[in-house]
């Protein structure tokens, strides 16, 4: 703001003019004090009149002198240039009425939003570069000479091998029971019961997990004809949140060449929900936030976080 005011303005004369204004105010105050006190401190009436007139004239001369000095300095101050060095952007340095033109707060909010967007975009880019979102080992590419696509061997594992992997995982976690069924042919469907906390329906394609649905322990997981209900969501918001996080975990645990490791890692992550309603958030230390417990589990440390605290 000082740079804008300094254009065409004598700052030294401006400072002296302020001092002259203070001196003029003092002189005027002395005039009124003289009028207020009147004729005092003299024995005779004639002496009091002469002293009052002399004092009053001195005060008026002081006012006249200070006023002349202020007029002289006002001519030396000069006028600020109407052309701002930054054109219209130079007006931003002025002090607008906050209620009418909240420009500064809006610019600050936009700046914070832009920085946050750039930060999250960088994180998303790094994660997408590390994790492949494709569910197979095939890689996209266009070659000049097309080759016949070979069926990945990891997608056609024998059912006995899948049963053996699921059985070993079931023995790893005593508090988790896994029931395997094949209602639609060779593709397996798992009903995972985690203590008395929740139930998870896992739809598999060989050893690749395609879909997960998390429901409460007391909720029905079967349709009217007795089959596993793989489409309806849970009636509780907390288990809907866990379903969303489980879908995110499927995209995180991706290793097409070793699908058994992927299933074991996912089940280890799922087992961390055994204390869904007992573990506090590792960041805020609270058990509930907006009526929900910490529904997020870190993929590496398995620590509990609220959905908003993990960011």
From Swiss-Prot:
Entry keyword set: Activator, Methylation, Nucleus, Phosphoprotein, Transcription, Transcription regulation
Compartments where found: Nucleus
A single MF term (Gene Ontology): ubiquitin protein ligase activity
Principal location: nucleus
Domain of life where this protein originates: Eukaryota
Modified residues (N6-methyllysine): 134
GO biological process terms held by the UniProt record: positive regulation of transcription elongation by RNA polymerase II; positive regulation of transcription initiation by RNA polymerase II; protein ubiquitination; regulation of transcription by RNA polymerase II; RNA polymerase II preinitiation complex assembly; somatic stem cell population maintenance
Record's keyword annotation contains rRNA-binding: no
Quaternary structure annotation from Swiss-Prot or TrEMBL: Component of the Mediator complex, which is composed of MED1, MED4, MED6, MED7, MED8, MED9, MED10, MED11, MED12, MED13, MED13L, MED14, MED15, MED16, MED17, MED18, MED19, MED20, MED21, MED22, MED23, MED24, MED25, MED26, MED27, MED29, MED30, MED31, CCNC, CDK8 and CDC2L6/CDK11. The MED12, MED13, CCNC and CDK8 subunits form a distinct module termed the CDK8 module. Mediator containing the CDK8 module is less active than Mediator lacking this module in supporting transcriptional activation.
Cross-referenced PANTHER family: 34 KDA TRANSCRIPTIONAL CO-ACTIVATOR-RELATED, MEDIATOR OF RNA POLYMERASE II TRANSCRIPTION SUBUNIT 27
Family: Belongs to the Mediator complex subunit 27 family.
Function: Component of the Mediator complex, a coactivator involved in the regulated transcription of nearly all RNA polymerase II-dependent genes. Mediator functions as a bridge to convey information from gene-specific regulatory proteins to the basal RNA polymerase II transcription machinery. Mediator is recruited to promoters by direct interactions with regulatory proteins and serves as a scaffold for the assembly of a functional preinitiation complex with RNA polymerase II and the general transcription factors.
Protein name: Mediator of RNA polymerase II transcription subunit 27
């Amino acid at each position: 703001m000082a740079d804008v005011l300094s254009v065409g303005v004598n700052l030294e004369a401006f400072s002296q003019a302020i001092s002259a204004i203070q001196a003029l105010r003092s002189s005027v105050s002395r005039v009124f004090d003289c009028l207020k006190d009147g004729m005092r401190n003299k024995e005779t009436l004639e002496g009091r009149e002469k002293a009052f007139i002399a004092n009053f004239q001195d005060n008026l001369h002081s006012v006249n002198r200070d006023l002349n000095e202020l007029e002289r300095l006002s001519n030396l101050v000069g006028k600020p240039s109407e052309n701002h060095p930054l054109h219209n952007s130079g007006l931003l340095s002025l002090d607008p009425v906050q209620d009418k033109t909240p420009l500064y707060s809006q610019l600050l909010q936009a700046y914070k939003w832009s920085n946050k967007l750039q930060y999250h975009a960088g994180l998303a880019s790094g994660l997408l570069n590390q994790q492949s979102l494709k569910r197979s080992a095939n890689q996209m590419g266009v070659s000049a000479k097309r080759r016949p696509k070979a069926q990945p061997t990891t997608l056609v594992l024998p059912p006995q091998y899948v049963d053996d992997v699921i059985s070993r995982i079931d023995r790893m976690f005593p508090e988790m029971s896994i029931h395997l069924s094949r209602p639609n042919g060779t593709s397996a469907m798992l009903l995972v019961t985690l203590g008395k906390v929740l139930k998870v329906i896992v739809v598999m394609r060989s050893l690749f997990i395609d879909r997960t649905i998390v429901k409460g322990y007391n909720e029905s997981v079967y349709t009217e004809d007795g089959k596993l209900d793989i489409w309806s969501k849970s009636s509780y918001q907390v288990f809907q949140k866990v379903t969303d996080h489980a879908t995110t975990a499927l995209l995180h645990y991706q290793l097409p060449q070793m699908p058994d490791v992927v299933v074991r890692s996912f089940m280890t992550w799922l087992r961390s929900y055994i204390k869904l309603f007992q573990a506090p958030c590792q960041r805020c230390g609270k058990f509930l936030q907006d009526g929900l417990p910490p529904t997020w589990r870190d993929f590496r440390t398995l620590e509990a976080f609220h959905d908003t605290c993990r960011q």
